[in-house]
Regions:
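Short hydrophobic/aromatic beta-strand or adjacent loop that forms the aromatic wall/cage
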Residues: 61, 165-169
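Conserved GNAT acetyl-CoA-binding A-motif
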Residues: 125-138
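Conserved active-site alpha-helix within GNAT-family acetyltransferase domains
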Residues: 115, 139-157, 163
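Alpha-helical elements of Rossmann-like donor-binding domains used by nucleotide-donor carbohydrate transfer enzymes
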Residues: 14-21, 49, 116, 120
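Conserved acetyl-CoA-binding loop-helix of GNAT-fold acetyltransferases
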Residues: 104, 110-123, 148
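Conserved N-terminal entry element of GNAT/NAT acetyltransferase domains
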Residues: 1-34, 176-178
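Acetyl-CoA-dependent GNAT
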Residues: 22, 40-100, 105
């Protein structure tokens, strides 16, 4: 049975292992798996985000995880807009929360786990009175998904990560997607 849960100190090690699995898989599927420095940076950033959530009890960052039994199969979080989003939008989106760390374990993809996590984060944002958020992606496979869900990005940074590797940023109204 699928369960959505908040992180705990006890689950920290398991969650970090989950990040390593999904980020490594994402890098490999994107054809950038040999870029080990960026891979490790991405994993460390997610660990830091998770620590921020646990240390602030969800005030600074707010994670949700999907579990099937005792196996973590998905993640999502929201928190302050990243420096990348602030810089690339000339601070236009600096005051919006950013939804991110949307990952589904490779063995559970295309089964609705991501949609369930999105629905839960939309509910959380609504309960907190948050009407819009931003979301960004440099991963081509994820960009296809976000384009279907949110339409064309509000910001398109061509070849931002190298030739053929764009970066996209969306500004989304919760009422438009929920």
């Amino acid at each position: 049975m699928l369960e959505i849960r908040r992180p705990s100190i006890e689950s920290f090690k398991q969650l970090n292992h989950f990040f390593r699995i999904v980020i490594t898989d994402t890098f490999n599927k994107e054809g950038i798996g040999d870029n080990l420095e960026d891979l490790e940076q991405e994993i460390e950033m997610k660990k830091a985000y998770l620590e921020s959530d646990i240390n602030s009890n969800g005030e600074n960052r707010y994670f949700l995880f999907a579990l099937e039994g005792d196996i973590i199969i998905g993640s999502i979080e929201y928190g302050p807009a990243s420096n990348l989003i602030k810089t690339c939008t000339n601070n236009v989106l600096k005051d919006l929360p950013e939804v991110g760390t949307v990952f589904v374990h490779p063995d559970y993809q295309r089964n609705g786990v991501g949609n369930l996590l999105l629905r839960e984060i939309y509910l959380t944002l609504m309960k907190k009175g948050i009407e819009e958020f931003c979301l960004d992606s440099g991963y081509r496979n994820a960009q296809k998904i976000w384009n279907k869900k949110f339409g064309e990005p509000d910001y398109l940074l061509k070849d931002f990560w190298g030739e053929g590797y764009d970066h996209m940023i969306w500004k989304v109204k919760v009422k438009d997607v929920f």
